[in-house]
Amino acid sequence: MACIDNAMRALFLLALFCVVHGEKAKSKDNDAKASGPGGSFDITKLGASGNGKTDSTKAVQEAWASACGGTGKQTILIPKGDFLVGPLNFTGPCKGDVTIQVNGNLLATTDLSQYKDHGNWIEILRVDNLVITGKGKLDGQGPAVWSKNSCVKKYDCKILPNSLVMDFVNNGEVSGITLLNSKFFHMNMYKCKDMLIKDVNVTAPGDSPNTDGIHMGDSSGVTITNTVIGVGDDCISIGPGTSKVNITGVTCGPGHGISIGSLGRYKDEKDVTDINVKDCTLKKTANGVRIKAYEDAASVLTASKIHYENIKMEDSGYPIIIDMKYCPNKLCTANGASKVTVKDVTFKNITGTSSTPEAVNLLCTAKIPCTGVTMDDVNIKYSGTNNKTMAVCKNAKGSAKGCLKELACF
């Protein structure tokens, strides 16, 4: 019996040894499998290479699958290095809260055949409580493909991949990172709610096509703060159906300014309301703070309760502009009147210099005038010497006080 007991004990110890070491090996070989609440997934331990040449798409996708499938707080680590990846799809809902820690750089493939029609580079869908943070970069490598952009020439065009797209994301945060040289828009939010964008840098050449910095549509509760944006299109663009937006401490330039719109291009667009832009600086931008609606608008909608305050212009073109006959590159299909209503807009303490004589442009339509426009302490001077500072105001109704006399439209 003793022999049997000793043999059983030996077998038990051997089995235990195998189980323990087997689990260690399994854990070492596959760090992507979460074993309980909380977890961290380093993409280099899943096969990613930081040499900037090896395709690391599979490793990043595996890290997402494991982090999204784990409970508690999960972290995907992008360590220092340059990681080449193709299109990434991060789909929820997730069982826990996921943080993507970007310490290194993700480089987008320049092979457009890898992107499906109207595809994006990094697309995040139906994920709540997402955090993307770090000091690394999301590099769209746009210079390699910008020449293939046809949207600057024709109305109906094939869109190049956006860099970071978040759809149906609630209570999300993007902080600290740099978005660089997107092929199209750098960041695009659609039907998102309660989003915080802070301490972000967005960078592309001033002549890069359609490289909007941050765009949002059909979203609410978006805050953008302490962010520097220099791009080839709008620094920030607020699309239809958006409300409760707060933009503070943003430096914009180069770029086309901070815009609401374009509005009315597509059918069934929804209203824009409760937009606040405060304590921002615009440097050598093509436009300043702008509201724009297509002159051949397909939708009837209203933009209202819009407040601009403490905005400094540094040699920006058209610092204040409401354009209800917007028609980029003269590609509109008809010379019609916009169906968009603009009302209850305040410009308060807007100062600095303009690169164009027209420091204020309120270009509304006779059929639907702009109403409730308040200009309070607007003091912008033309920086040139060949003309004088002026305002161009058509079909706009409101009040002005404390403004440079040349800019008081009312």
Curated annotation (Swiss-Prot):
Pollen. It comes from Zea mays (Maize). This is Exopolygalacturonase. The keyword Repeat applies. Disulfide bonds join 235-252, 364-370, 393-409. Glycans are attached at residues 89, 201, 246, 349, 387. One of its GO terms (biological process) is carbohydrate metabolic process. It is found in: Secreted; Secreted, Cell wall. May function in depolymerizing pectin during pollen development, germination, and tube growth. Acts as an exo-polygalacturonase. Belongs to the glycosyl hydrolase 28 family. It is an enzyme of class 3 (hydrolase). GO terms for cellular component: extracellular region.
